[in-house]
Curated annotation (Swiss-Prot):
Phylogenetic placement of the source organism: Eukaryota, Fungi, Dikarya, Ascomycota, Saccharomycotina
Catalytic activity of the protein: L-seryl-[protein] + ATP = O-phospho-L-seryl-[protein] + ADP + H(+); L-threonyl-[protein] + ATP = O-phospho-L-threonyl-[protein] + ADP + H(+)
Keyword Metal-binding among record annotations: no
Residue list for modification Phosphotyrosine: Y185
Key word Transmembrane helix present: no
Pfam families according to UniProt: Pkinase (PF00069)
Keywords, comma-separated and alphabetical: ATP-binding, Cell cycle, Cytoplasm, Kinase, Nucleotide-binding, Nucleus, Periplasm, Phosphoprotein, Serine/threonine-protein kinase, Transferase
Enzyme class: transferase
Main location: nucleus
Protein name stated in the entry: Mitogen-activated protein kinase KSS1
Provenance organism: Saccharomyces cerevisiae (strain ATCC 204508 / S288c) (Baker's yeast)
């Protein structure tokens, strides 16, 4: 028996089809009747967990901030609640995209299509163009993975799902850092940078570059590069390809347990990519960029802005059309609160009423 899904939305939208469901949200395609434009409407029911409310506020604030960026999904409209007491669900109207990179890669493996080197270049360029802008605003996305990269038939790519993103304190350093912060719910394991598992002292925008490198490799081979079953297996797979960390890189690791684990592994040289994939016809520029993205030490990893200038992306690189954004205003009450939360248990101490007020205020703001 079919389950009924209720969307309490204005009459100018006509629901068409269910697109997807997640832990606390449902997405349907719809038509904006006055214009005939197809849209996606996301229904979020975040109030079962404070964590979901903070993610929802983050998502709305950041998508507002990056509104109209060609490679970041846009919120076109929000359904304003009648009152805060009637706020039981959040409805966001977004651009409708046809698929995501995960589905495209899966289809490639099923023999339906093959990603050409041109496709791989263009998708990589668009991911990095988005990351340059995100990082310039001193934001780390923290969940870059194929299913969060939406695509249409023109091969336009848009980054979505900013619910896990974090804002960094202002700094004159170009490689922004978030000192000491980590939670158990960041980043899908296969795309997770080694510093997250090894508790380096600082977490930086380089985390997103590692994820982008994993995705570049997956587009080339059609298979996840580091499909770890658990923490130890993930680390084993990374070191199997990158080789044993240098003494300098080893000393960046702060976790005593992680250091002992790595010290007890056999010494290994890095594997050539031709060996990793059993391929000999690899684009040398792609290999060079991949090496620069997948540096074990985040300080040695290429930045998004540097990667856009790499020869592999020369066909698309246009310095006049790769925007930077000013840093977010961290005096905003939500960002001040968000940046104080260092552990999940601290999130639980925040009154749900305060978070609901912040979410309501965000929904009542006009679209700019």
């Amino acid at each position: 028996m079919a389950r009924t899904i209720t969307f309490d939305i204005p009459s100018q939208y006509k629901l068409v089809d269910l697109i997807g469901e997640g832990a606390y949200g449902t997405v349907c395609s719809a038509i904006h009747k006055p214009s005939g434009i197809k849209v996606a409407i996301k229904k979020i029911q975040p109030f079962s967990k404070k964590l979901f409310v903070t993610r929802t506020i983050r998502e709305i604030k950041l998508l507002r901030y990056f509104h109209e960026h060609e490679n970041i999904i846009s919120i076109l409209d929000k359904v304003r609640p009648v009152s805060i007491d009637k706020l039981n669900a959040v409805y966001l109207v977004e651009e409708l995209m046809e698929t995501d990179l995960q589905k495209v890669i899966n289809n490639q493996n099923s023999g339906f299509s093959t990603l050409s080197d041109d496709h791989v270049q263009y998708f990589t360029y668009q991911i990095l163009r988005a990351l340059k802008s995100i990082h310039s605003a001193q934001v780390i996305h923290r969940d870059i993975k194929p299913s969060n990269l939406l695509l249409n038939s023109n091969c336009d790519l848009k980054v979505c799902d900013f619910g896990l993103a974090r804002c960094l304190a202002s700094s004159s350093d170009s490689r922004e850092t978030l000192v000491g912060f980590m939670t158990e719910y960041v980043a899908t394991r296969w795309y997770r940078a080694p510093e997250i598992m090894l508790t380096f002292q600082e977490y930086t925008t380089a985390m997103d570059i590692w994820s982008c490198g994993c995705i570049l490799a997956e587009m080339v081979s059609g298979k996840p590069l580091f499909p770890g079953r658990d923490y130890h297996h993930q680390l084993w797979l990374i070191l199997e390809v990158l080789g044993t960390p240098s003494f300098e890189d080893f000393n960046q690791i702060k976790s005593k347990r992680a250091k002992e684990y790595i010290a007890n592994l056999p010494m290994r040289p890095p594997l050539p990519w031709e060996t990793v994939w059993s391929k000999t016809d690899l684009n040398p520029d792609m290999i060079d960029l991949l090496d620069k993205m997948l540096q074990f030490n985040p300080d040695k990893r290429i930045s998004a802005a540097e990667a856009l200038r790499h020869p592999y992306l020369a066909m698309y690189h246009d310095p006049s059309d790769e925007p930077e954004y000013p840093p977010l205003n961290l005096d905003d009450e939500f960002w001040k609160l968000d940046n104080k939360i260092m552990r999940p248990e601290e999130e639980e101490e925040v009154p749900i009423e305060m978070l609901k007020d912040m979410l309501y205020d965000e929904l009542m703001k006009t679209m700019e």
